Amino acid sequence: MADDPRSGRPVMIDHQRIVSVTLVAPPKKYGVTHWSSRLLGRHLGISNTTVARAWRDYGVQPWRLETSKVPTDPELVGKVTDVVGLYLAPPENAVVLCVDEKSQIQALDRTAPMLPMQPGLPARRTHDYERHGTSTLFAALDIATGTVTGACKPRHRHQEFLAFLKQVARAYPDRELHLVMDNYATHKRVEVRDWLTANPRIRVHFTPTSGSWLNLVEVWFGIIERQAIHRGSFPSVKDLNAKIRAFITGWNDRCHPFVWTKTADQILKKANRKTTSTTRH
């Protein structure tokens, strides 16, 4: 004798219902900001594995959180259109440079040598370090080639910024330059504006307020941070500066341009999205 085939235990609650509850903030009695699979399972009277399976099927991840900032620049549309236009259709016979500074780079020296990576083991370093001062890296990224003009300076006042602009101008003599910059105060000092007025071949294009992400040199700053600074050990600011310059030299030997893909309309549509949250937050 044998049992007839059976369908198994009937489904108590479907995945769509689980997800719909997940998208609503937990009741105040729980004192939490978002659901965990165990808490939601207990709340619905089902297993946490069932909750986790529903989340996986629908791509729901309550534990994740991203930050955003509502654009407030009254010139948002014009600035985004201007900068993105330079990236997607740069002017002929001109150079477009993304300019900014990476300030307060710390010269940190580990108290013991780093242990190298081995099969099955990542590189290791001590948590303890000694501080030996800071440096500021000024950089100008050529969007057509990816090459970088850089300079390390002890401070990041308008004096240092203006000196760097003059260095950039010397690096591109007799060329029309379009500089993409953010709204940092030193970039708008009267001394800087006067110098730009006296050099009409150099034009500035400002990113929107809180829109530094539009500046492609920020991508390059992330690269140098990951590849040369974060895991480095620097016994002095002089050593830090030397290694930054070495990275720039190596980068320029193997560089490539960054390709901008989104249009201004796509960016503005996303920036102007209305809030659709239905939670009580």
What name fits each language-model region?
Residues 109, 239-281:
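C-terminal domain-tail junction helix/linker
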Residues 175-187:
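Acidic/histidine-rich, metal-coordinating catalytic segments
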Residues 148, 217-239, 250-252:
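Active-site proximal helix-loop segment of RNase H-like, two-metal nucleases, encompassing DDE(D)
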Residues 80-166, 269-277:
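Extended, low-complexity cationic-aromatic segments
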Residues 124-129, 198-216, 232-234:
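RNase H-like polynucleotidyl transferase catalytic core
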Residues 2-50, 90-91:
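A short, amphipathic alpha-helix used for macromolecular contacts
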Residues 1-12, 55-90, 109-119:
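Basic, flexible linker segments flanking DNA-binding modules
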